[in-house]
Protein backbone atom coordinates (compact mmCIF):
# COMPACT_ATOMS: atom_id res chain seq x y z
CA UNK A 1 0.00 0.00 0.00
CA UNK A 2 2.72 2.44 1.00
CA UNK A 3 4.70 1.70 -2.17
CA UNK A 4 1.76 2.25 -4.51
CA UNK A 5 0.66 5.44 -2.77
CA UNK A 6 3.29 6.86 -0.38
CA UNK A 7 0.94 9.61 0.78
CA UNK A 8 -1.56 7.10 2.20
CA UNK A 9 -1.53 7.18 6.03
CA UNK A 10 -0.65 3.67 7.17
CA UNK A 11 -0.21 2.24 10.65
CA UNK A 12 0.36 -1.46 11.28
CA UNK A 13 1.49 -3.98 13.86
CA UNK A 14 3.67 -6.32 11.84
CA UNK A 15 4.78 -9.26 13.98
CA UNK A 16 7.23 -10.21 16.68
CA UNK A 17 10.05 -12.46 17.82
CA UNK A 18 9.24 -12.38 21.49
CA UNK A 19 11.43 -13.58 24.34
CA UNK A 20 11.14 -14.38 28.02
CA UNK A 21 14.28 -14.16 30.17
CA UNK A 22 14.52 -16.44 33.22
CA UNK A 23 17.24 -15.58 35.73
CA UNK A 24 18.53 -17.61 38.67
CA UNK A 25 16.38 -15.52 41.01
CA UNK A 26 13.15 -16.45 39.25
CA UNK A 27 10.50 -18.86 40.51
CA UNK A 28 11.20 -21.74 38.14
CA UNK A 29 7.88 -23.53 38.44
CA UNK A 30 5.94 -20.30 37.98
CA UNK A 31 8.16 -19.37 35.04
CA UNK A 32 7.54 -22.69 33.29
CA UNK A 33 3.79 -22.20 33.64
CA UNK A 34 4.00 -18.73 32.11
CA UNK A 35 6.34 -19.80 29.32
CA UNK A 36 4.33 -22.77 28.04
CA UNK A 37 1.10 -20.76 28.15
CA UNK A 38 2.73 -17.93 26.18
CA UNK A 39 4.50 -20.21 23.70
CA UNK A 40 1.86 -22.82 22.93
CA UNK A 41 -1.51 -21.18 23.53
CA UNK A 42 -3.31 -20.67 20.19
CA UNK A 43 -0.68 -23.04 18.78
CA UNK A 44 1.85 -20.22 19.02
CA UNK A 45 -0.08 -18.25 16.41
CA UNK A 46 -0.23 -14.93 18.23
CA UNK A 47 2.04 -12.06 17.30
CA UNK A 48 2.72 -11.71 21.03
CA UNK A 49 3.56 -15.40 21.58
CA UNK A 50 6.79 -16.43 23.28
CA UNK A 51 9.23 -17.86 20.74
CA UNK A 52 12.48 -17.61 22.73
CA UNK A 53 13.33 -18.59 26.30
CA UNK A 54 16.66 -17.20 27.49
CA UNK A 55 17.78 -19.02 30.64
CA UNK A 56 20.62 -18.15 33.00
CA UNK A 57 23.24 -20.90 32.97
CA UNK A 58 22.70 -22.23 36.51
CA UNK A 59 19.03 -22.84 35.66
CA UNK A 60 19.77 -24.00 32.11
CA UNK A 61 22.09 -26.73 33.44
CA UNK A 62 19.63 -27.89 36.10
CA UNK A 63 18.33 -31.28 34.96
CA UNK A 64 15.27 -30.90 37.16
CA UNK A 65 14.34 -27.68 35.37
CA UNK A 66 14.74 -29.36 31.99
CA UNK A 67 12.50 -32.24 32.97
CA UNK A 68 9.82 -29.94 34.37
CA UNK A 69 9.81 -27.83 31.21
CA UNK A 70 9.59 -30.98 29.11
CA UNK A 71 6.77 -32.36 31.23
CA UNK A 72 4.81 -29.10 31.05
CA UNK A 73 5.07 -28.99 27.26
CA UNK A 74 4.18 -32.64 26.69
CA UNK A 75 1.27 -32.49 29.15
CA UNK A 76 -0.66 -29.94 27.11
CA UNK A 77 -3.75 -31.37 25.44
CA UNK A 78 -3.48 -31.15 21.64
CA UNK A 79 -6.07 -31.73 18.93
CA UNK A 80 -9.36 -30.57 17.47
CA UNK A 81 -10.82 -27.27 18.65
CA UNK A 82 -14.18 -29.04 18.89
CA UNK A 83 -12.84 -30.82 21.96
CA UNK A 84 -12.96 -28.22 24.75
CA UNK A 85 -10.34 -30.15 26.69
CA UNK A 86 -7.67 -29.38 24.11
CA UNK A 87 -5.38 -26.41 24.71
CA UNK A 88 -3.36 -26.52 21.48
CA UNK A 89 -5.33 -26.69 18.26
CA UNK A 90 -4.45 -26.84 14.56
CA UNK A 91 -2.32 -24.30 12.75
CA UNK A 92 -3.86 -22.02 10.16
CA UNK A 93 -1.68 -23.55 7.42
CA UNK A 94 0.47 -26.61 6.83
CA UNK A 95 2.67 -24.66 4.41
CA UNK A 96 4.52 -22.39 6.85
CA UNK A 97 7.97 -22.69 5.28
CA UNK A 98 9.66 -20.71 8.05
CA UNK A 99 8.36 -23.07 10.71
CA UNK A 100 9.14 -26.17 8.67
CA UNK A 101 12.73 -25.01 8.22
CA UNK A 102 13.04 -24.38 11.96
CA UNK A 103 12.01 -27.98 12.60
CA UNK A 104 15.48 -28.96 11.40
CA UNK A 105 18.38 -28.90 13.86
CA UNK A 106 21.31 -26.54 13.42
CA UNK A 107 24.77 -26.91 14.93
CA UNK A 108 24.71 -27.36 18.70
CA UNK A 109 20.94 -27.79 18.90
CA UNK A 110 18.96 -30.75 20.20
CA UNK A 111 15.33 -31.58 20.88
CA UNK A 112 14.03 -31.36 24.43
CA UNK A 113 10.61 -32.11 22.95
CA UNK A 114 10.91 -33.28 19.32
CA UNK A 115 8.37 -32.16 16.69
CA UNK A 116 5.39 -34.43 16.24
CA UNK A 117 2.52 -33.89 13.81
CA UNK A 118 -0.66 -35.51 15.06
CA UNK A 119 -2.55 -35.59 11.75
CA UNK A 120 -1.63 -36.81 8.29
CA UNK A 121 -2.07 -33.37 6.71
CA UNK A 122 0.34 -31.76 9.21
CA UNK A 123 -1.92 -29.06 10.56
CA UNK A 124 -1.66 -30.18 14.19
CA UNK A 125 1.83 -29.85 15.65
CA UNK A 126 2.32 -30.79 19.28
CA UNK A 127 4.31 -28.35 21.47
CA UNK A 128 7.94 -28.54 20.42
CA UNK A 129 11.01 -27.39 22.37
CA UNK A 130 14.41 -26.90 20.77
CA UNK A 131 17.35 -26.85 23.19
CA UNK A 132 20.73 -25.17 22.80
CA UNK A 133 19.68 -22.57 20.25
CA UNK A 134 22.51 -20.16 19.50
CA UNK A 135 22.22 -16.39 19.07
CA UNK A 136 22.03 -15.44 15.41
CA UNK A 137 20.80 -18.84 14.27
CA UNK A 138 17.72 -19.26 12.09
CA UNK A 139 15.45 -20.29 14.95
CA UNK A 140 16.77 -17.45 17.10
CA UNK A 141 16.05 -14.61 14.71
CA UNK A 142 13.03 -15.76 12.66
CA UNK A 143 9.36 -15.29 13.54
CA UNK A 144 7.92 -18.81 13.22
CA UNK A 145 4.23 -18.39 14.15
CA UNK A 146 3.78 -21.93 15.44
CA UNK A 147 4.06 -24.05 18.60
CA UNK A 148 7.86 -24.17 18.82
CA UNK A 149 9.96 -22.76 21.66
CA UNK A 150 13.71 -22.16 21.32
CA UNK A 151 15.77 -22.27 24.53
CA UNK A 152 19.00 -20.25 24.76
CA UNK A 153 21.64 -20.32 27.51
CA UNK A 154 22.81 -16.94 28.85
CA UNK A 155 25.45 -16.03 31.42
CA UNK A 156 23.50 -13.23 33.09
CA UNK A 157 20.61 -10.84 32.69
CA UNK A 158 22.69 -8.19 30.95
CA UNK A 159 23.63 -10.62 28.20
CA UNK A 160 20.00 -11.67 27.88
CA UNK A 161 18.89 -8.07 27.44
CA UNK A 162 21.54 -7.47 24.79
CA UNK A 163 20.46 -10.58 22.87
CA UNK A 164 16.78 -9.66 22.99
CA UNK A 165 17.57 -6.12 21.86
CA UNK A 166 19.63 -7.50 18.96
CA UNK A 167 16.47 -8.93 17.38
CA UNK A 168 14.82 -7.07 14.51
CA UNK A 169 11.47 -7.12 16.31
CA UNK A 170 10.26 -5.46 19.50
CA UNK A 171 6.65 -6.35 20.29
CA UNK A 172 6.29 -8.14 23.65
CA UNK A 173 8.93 -9.25 26.13
CA UNK A 174 8.97 -10.93 29.54
CA UNK A 175 11.17 -11.32 32.61
CA UNK A 176 10.91 -14.07 35.20
CA UNK A 177 12.81 -12.75 38.22
CA UNK A 178 12.05 -11.98 41.87
CA UNK A 179 15.00 -9.61 42.17
CA UNK A 180 13.87 -5.98 42.18
CA UNK A 181 17.20 -4.72 40.85
CA UNK A 182 16.98 -7.14 37.92
CA UNK A 183 13.44 -5.99 37.26
CA UNK A 184 14.53 -2.35 37.29
CA UNK A 185 17.46 -3.01 34.92
CA UNK A 186 15.27 -4.98 32.53
CA UNK A 187 12.44 -2.41 32.47
CA UNK A 188 14.88 0.40 31.74
CA UNK A 189 16.82 -1.48 29.04
CA UNK A 190 14.58 -3.80 27.04
CA UNK A 191 13.37 -2.65 23.62
CA UNK A 192 9.79 -3.83 23.22
CA UNK A 193 6.34 -2.30 23.25
CA UNK A 194 4.58 -4.40 25.91
CA UNK A 195 6.55 -5.63 28.92
CA UNK A 196 5.53 -8.32 31.41
CA UNK A 197 7.18 -9.37 34.68
CA UNK A 198 6.48 -12.76 36.28
CA UNK A 199 3.47 -13.50 34.07
CA UNK A 200 2.71 -14.57 30.53
CA UNK A 201 3.43 -12.21 27.65
CA UNK A 202 0.17 -12.61 25.71
CA UNK A 203 -3.36 -11.40 26.32
CA UNK A 204 -3.27 -7.60 26.42
CA UNK A 205 -6.81 -6.50 27.28
CA UNK A 206 -8.59 -4.11 24.92
CA UNK A 207 -9.30 -0.69 26.48
CA UNK A 208 -6.94 -1.48 29.37
CA UNK A 209 -3.53 -2.24 27.90
CA UNK A 210 -2.66 -0.47 24.63
CA UNK A 211 -0.81 -2.92 22.39
CA UNK A 212 2.02 -2.30 19.95
CA UNK A 213 5.75 -2.46 19.43
CA UNK A 214 8.82 -0.96 17.84
CA UNK A 215 11.45 -1.75 15.19
CA UNK A 216 10.03 -4.28 12.67
CA UNK A 217 7.03 -4.89 14.94
CA UNK A 218 5.46 -1.58 13.97
CA UNK A 219 4.94 0.54 10.90
CA UNK A 220 3.66 4.07 10.84
CA UNK A 221 3.19 6.47 13.72
CA UNK A 222 4.40 3.99 16.29
CA UNK A 223 1.33 4.41 18.48
CA UNK A 224 -0.40 1.47 20.09
CA UNK A 225 -3.74 -0.07 19.22
CA UNK A 226 -6.17 0.88 21.94
CA UNK A 227 -4.10 3.88 22.96
CA UNK A 228 -5.45 7.43 23.05
CA UNK A 229 -3.56 8.47 19.90
CA UNK A 230 -4.10 5.33 17.81
CA UNK A 231 -5.94 7.18 15.02
CA UNK A 232 -3.96 10.41 15.27
CA UNK A 233 -2.01 9.73 12.07
CA UNK A 234 -5.27 9.56 10.08
CA UNK A 235 -6.71 12.93 11.11
CA UNK A 236 -5.74 16.57 11.24
CA UNK A 237 -6.33 18.30 14.54
CA UNK A 238 -6.70 22.06 14.73
CA UNK A 239 -8.11 24.69 17.09
CA UNK A 240 -10.88 27.01 16.00
CA UNK A 241 -10.73 30.40 17.74
CA UNK A 242 -13.89 31.24 19.61
CA UNK A 243 -15.24 27.72 19.32
CA UNK A 244 -15.64 25.76 22.55
CA UNK A 245 -17.69 22.75 23.55
CA UNK A 246 -19.57 22.39 26.80
CA UNK A 247 -18.97 18.67 27.30
CA UNK A 248 -21.14 18.53 30.42
CA UNK A 249 -24.09 19.81 28.42
CA UNK A 250 -23.37 18.01 25.14
CA UNK A 251 -22.41 14.62 26.62
CA UNK A 252 -24.05 14.44 30.07
CA UNK A 253 -23.84 10.66 30.52
CA UNK A 254 -20.19 10.41 29.49
CA UNK A 255 -19.33 13.45 31.62
CA UNK A 256 -21.01 11.95 34.66
CA UNK A 257 -19.25 8.59 34.23
CA UNK A 258 -15.88 10.26 33.89
CA UNK A 259 -16.06 13.01 36.50
CA UNK A 260 -18.88 12.20 38.92
CA UNK A 261 -16.52 10.46 41.35
Regions found by a protein language model. Give the residues of each.
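ALDH superfamily catalytic-core signature
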Residues: 1-134, 158, 197, 243-261
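Conserved C-terminal structural/oligomerization subdomain of aldehyde/semialdehyde dehydrogenase
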Residues: 21, 33, 72-78, 117-119, ...
Amino acid sequence: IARSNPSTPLSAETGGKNAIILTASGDRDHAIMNVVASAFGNAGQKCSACSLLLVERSVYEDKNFREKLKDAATSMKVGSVWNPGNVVGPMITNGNDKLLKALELEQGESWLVPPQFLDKNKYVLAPTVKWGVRPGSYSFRTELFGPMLSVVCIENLQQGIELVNSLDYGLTSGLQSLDEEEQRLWKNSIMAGNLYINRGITGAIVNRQPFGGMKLSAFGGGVKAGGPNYCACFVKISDKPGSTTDYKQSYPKAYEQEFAH
